[in-house]
Amino acid sequence: MSVIKITKDNFENEVMNCEKTVLLDFYADWCGPCRMVSPIVDAISEEHPEYKVGKVNVDEENQLATTFGVMSIPSLFVIRNGEVVNQTVGARTKAQILDMLK
């Protein structure tokens, strides 16, 4: 499954109303650690169809970033049944991100 670009317009449908566990990656194109995490998030999306993976560009979607209290990036959030069940800030390994999703 490919990564979905999350915006304020599709957030409710793609994230809050999703039956799958959702991994949200808050990032910016200029962020070095974000560029390290991005291919890991992409791989998880392809290798684990049981999860929905979305990315939120904080420069384009500052309202969503504010709603989630994102102060530093990359910020990863795990959402299950419309509730944040796990979150982390900073670059993480694939194993660490997969552990968050369990």
Regions found by a protein language model. Give the residues of each.
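Conserved Rossmann-like nucleotide-binding pocket used by diverse enzymes
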Residues: 2, 7, 27, 54
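A short beta-strand-turn-helix
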Residues: 3-22, 62
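Non-catalytic, surface beta->alpha helical segment in thiol-disulfide oxidoreductase systems
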Residues: 80-102
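Conserved redox-active cysteine motifs that mediate thiol-disulfide chemistry
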Residues: 26-40
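Short pre-active-site segment immediately N-terminal to redox-active cysteine/selenocysteine motifs
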Residues: 19, 26-30, 72
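Residue-level signature of catalytic and energy-coupling elements of molecular machines
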Residues: 11, 24, 41, 57, ...
